[in-house]
Amino acid sequence: MKKLSLLAMLTVLIGSALFVTSCGGKIQADTVWQLTKSAGVSVEAQKQYVCFGADGKVIVATKASGTLVKVSLLSGDYTAKGGKIKAPMIAGGVEADYKISGETMKITYNKAELYELKKVSSPTAKEMKAL
């Protein structure tokens, strides 16, 4: 009886840990991220933004002269599941790895950093979708 109780408690504990870990690394729908690094080089001054929509669409935009402009070539359908992401903004259409830690997301391919992004409140997902 004690072994069964211990096994049940261990199962709940491991399940809870997996739930917390998997939820912490998921891309939240309708969030906007600013590109801060590309291939390890700072690009924050270029003001490039990425919106991951709940509808499976990614919108990439740049803020030129104070106006948001959609980058159609890098926008389109995306998938993100289990720490893997596939999106038009990733060259070659490859599936890359992503990891979210707090307000920072890193996208890597073969352990090489492709992008580093930070979550932002402006522009909003609504503004990005209106482009």
Where are these regions (language model features)?
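Bacterial signal peptide processing site
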Residues: 24-26
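C-terminal partner/receptor-binding element of secreted or periplasmic proteins
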Residues: 111-131
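A glycine-anchored, Pro-Gly-centered beta-turn/N-cap motif
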Residues: 29-31, 76
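Structural signal for glycine-centered tight turns and loop->strand junctions in beta-sheet-rich domains
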Residues: 54-58
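Contiguous, well-ordered beta-strand patches that form the walls/edges
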Residues: 38-44, 59-115
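Bacterial N-terminal signal peptides
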Residues: 9-17
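Bacterial N-terminal signal peptides that target proteins for export
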Residues: 1-9
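C-terminal motif of bacterial Sec signal peptides marking the signal peptidase cleavage site
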Residues: 18-22
